[in-house]
């Protein structure tokens, strides 16, 4: 039977991608349905209890700048906040927070249940309704049919999921949840390329059985960082430390002696695992010269006794997991409350997607999250927001939108996936971006909030706050530009006390701030340049914009040159065999990838600059050279 009301957008799956997709579509005024197999696990942290990190924190800030949920949720649920790379330049500084799993899930569910235009329905989806290569709805396990103009698949590791512990395995979407086998079979019937990937999680430890007195503590930062541009530290719950232990030669011997019982090394697992979050058995074998690996003992919450030992993800048998855990300092009497495991699951080749995350072959069908070959909550959330907003735009008969690589880490993520694809779980790093200095955490709102407002994602409160910040930055920069001090002025002695070389000529506030030894806080503590801005975010922007002005201008020039290629469009139906002069390898790769632009084509492995030149000449001769606005 059909549900009585049609929807504009259906989201299938309530993880980090699904919740952001649902919120985005609903915020844009589209009637949205979120289908989940269990309402109680909306926003569930299936693996590590943390948000952010290098590259990942940048994505969270971008999701927040576009009105998303993740940053607000972690501000309400974070139990330890830190800035990573704090001593380095602003481009690579990244926020990370430990989370209370229960508080995080509660924050996500509360936001979803209070979002207008959004209905949540608990039922597993077993089928899609596809008519003439267009998705028009979904069918649940009890046969209930829902109609919609667009459908977003955010099903995580549930598609034909298989859990491995030692040489034993069973079907599962994650520990305690059933897999989605009928939907997996249905998707395999569609003209989509599908493969298998693998990820894993460590055993959870009972905190009451760990001797923390012999372990080093790791505390959060003070003052506490904040994730959301709309947040403040007063929202954070109680803060707690993490602890550090290490593996040792005994640990490594246990692992080496039991590799024949590892499903990965025994050849039972087909899927490729994450390169940057390897299992402990993988680390021991790949880094055989290392006699120890650092393990972070992370609390799972304020009201839980469970500890997440970050760094010992494993699929070895339970008895071996016990030996591994008890071989480490402080853990000699530790008890495991949940075994570690590996999970193998279907993913779909993201090269079959447009940059909007819509399928190239099934109109109105969008993919986001681990189904696209990524790993991590943050990567999933960013894709979910993009897929949700584009599903909403499609349902409203509007053109899709995707950020450029020069505009956002989200743009880098989507371009990497859709242009290059992935053979292993993809994780975001700052090193993946060519324009890191422009794509900082601190300026995510300056880069994206205006576009978010145009798209209908940003509410009035955020928009007002954003404009206040912009005005504060502009006013303060003008004030510093127009405030001068001379070597003979009474205030010169106070200024010189903060400088490595004293003033030799007249200098403005901005001139002084450009000096490496002068910070904004120091400058505005001087009588001549007081007072400082009360808005700490605006003050940070003033300092970064002034200090890095030359570098930023140079990178902006590079971006403008690159945009000429990015904006040169390639016809979606072009058969590259028509282009004389291209090698067979280049023809095969271009026909396989079907890049949307010259810029995308240039990033495909094996497509040479010479091939790009041939292609540009051919397009011009054919009168097909078009540039996007």
From Swiss-Prot:
Main subcellular location of this protein, as a coarse class: cytoplasm
Stored SUPFAM superfamilies: FAD/NAD(P)-binding domain (SSF51905)
GO molecular function terms noted in the UniProt entry: flavin adenine dinucleotide binding
Cofactors that this protein relies on: FAD
GO CC, one annotated term: cytosol
Binding locations of NAD(+): 273-287
Compartments, as annotated in UniProt: Cytoplasm
GO BP terms in the entry: tRNA methylation; tRNA wobble uridine modification
Gene3D superfamilies per UniProt: FAD/NAD(P)-binding domain, GidA associated domain, C-terminal subdomain, tRNA uridine 5-carboxymethylaminomethyl modification enzyme MnmG/GidA
HAMAP family per record: MnmG_GidA
Job description of the protein: NAD-binding protein involved in the addition of a carboxymethylaminomethyl (cmnm) group at the wobble position (U34) of certain tRNAs, forming tRNA-cmnm(5)s(2)U34.
Protein name: tRNA uridine 5-carboxymethylaminomethyl modification enzyme MnmG
Source species of the chain: Salmonella dublin (strain CT_02021853)
């Amino acid at each position: 039977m059909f549900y009585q009301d049609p929807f504009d957008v259906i989201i299938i799956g309530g993880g980090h991608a699904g919740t952001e997709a649902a919120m985005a579509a609903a915020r844009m005024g589209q009637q949205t349905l979120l289908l989940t197999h269990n309402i109680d696990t909306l926003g569930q942290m299936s693996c590590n209890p943390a948000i952010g990190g290098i590259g990942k924190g940048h994505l969270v800030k971008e999701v927040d700048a576009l009105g998303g949920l993740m940053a607000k949720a972690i501000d309400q649920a974070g139990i330890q906040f830190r800035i990573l790379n704090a001593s380095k330049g602003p481009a690579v500084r990244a926020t990370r927070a430990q989370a209370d799993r229960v508080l995080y899930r509660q924050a996500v569910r509360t936001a979803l249940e209070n979002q207008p235009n959004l209905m949540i329905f608990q039922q597993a989806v077993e089928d899609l309704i596809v008519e003439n290569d267009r998705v028009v709805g979904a069918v649940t396990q009890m046969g209930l049919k829902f109609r919609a103009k667009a459908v977003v698949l955010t099903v995580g590791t549930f598609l034909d999921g298989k859990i491995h512990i030692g040489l034993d395995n069973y079907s599962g979407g994650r520990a305690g949840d059933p897999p989605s086998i009928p939907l997996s079979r249905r998707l395999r019937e569609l003209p989509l390329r599908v493969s298998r990937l693998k990820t894993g999680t460590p055993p959870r430890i009972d905190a009451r059985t760990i001797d923390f007195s012999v372990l080093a503590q790791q505390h959060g930062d003070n003052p506490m960082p904040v994730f959301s541009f709309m947040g403040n530290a007063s929202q954070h719950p109680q803060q707690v430390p993490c602890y550090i232990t290490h593996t040792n030669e005994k640990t490594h011997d246990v692992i080496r002696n039991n590799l024949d019982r590892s499903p990965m090394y025994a050849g039972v697992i087909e899927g490729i695992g994450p390169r940057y979050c390897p299992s402990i058995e993988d680390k021991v074998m790949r880094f055989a010269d290392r006699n120890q690996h650092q393990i972070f003992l992370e609390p799972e919450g304020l009201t839980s006794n469970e500890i997440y030992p970050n760094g010992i993800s494993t699929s070895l048998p339970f008895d071996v997991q016990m030996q591994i855990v008890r071989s480490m300092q402080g853990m000699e009497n530790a008890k495991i409350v949940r075994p570690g495991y590996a999970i193998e699951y279907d993913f779909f080749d993201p090269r079959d997607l447009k940059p909007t995350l819509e399928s190239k072959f099934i109109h109105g069908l969008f993919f986001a999250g681990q189904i696209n070959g990524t790993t991590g909550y943050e990567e999933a959330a960013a894709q979910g927001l993009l897929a949700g907003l584009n599903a909403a735009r499609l349902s409203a008969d509007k053109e899709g939108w995707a950020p450029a690589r020069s505009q956002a880490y989200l743009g880098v993520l989507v371009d990497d996936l859709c242009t290059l694809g992935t053979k292993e779980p993809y994780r975001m790093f700052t090193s993946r971006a060519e324009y890191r200095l422009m794509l900082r955490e601190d300026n995510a709102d300056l880069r994206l909030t205006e576009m978010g407002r145009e798209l209908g994602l940003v509410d009035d409160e955020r928009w007002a706050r954003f404009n206040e910040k912009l005005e504060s930055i502009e006013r303060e920069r003008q004030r510093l530009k127009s405030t001068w001090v001379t070597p003979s002025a009474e205030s010169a002695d106070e200024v010189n006390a903060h400088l490595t070389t004293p003033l030799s000529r007249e200098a403005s506030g901005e001139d002084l701030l450009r000096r490496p030894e002068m910070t904004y806080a120091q400058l505005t503590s001087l009588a001549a340049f007081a007072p400082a801005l009360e808005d700490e975010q605006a003050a940070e922007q003033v300092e970064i914009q002034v200090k890095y002005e030359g570098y930023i201008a140079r990178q902006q020039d590079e971006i403008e040159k690159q945009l000429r290629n990015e904006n040169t469009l390639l016809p979606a139906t072009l058969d590259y065999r028509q282009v004389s002069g291209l090698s067979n390898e280049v023809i095969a790769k271009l026909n396989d990838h079907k890049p949307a632009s010259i810029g995308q084509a240039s990033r495909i492995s094996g497509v040479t600059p010479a091939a790009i030149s041939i292609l540009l000449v051919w397009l011009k001769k054919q009168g097909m050279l078009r540039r996007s606005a």
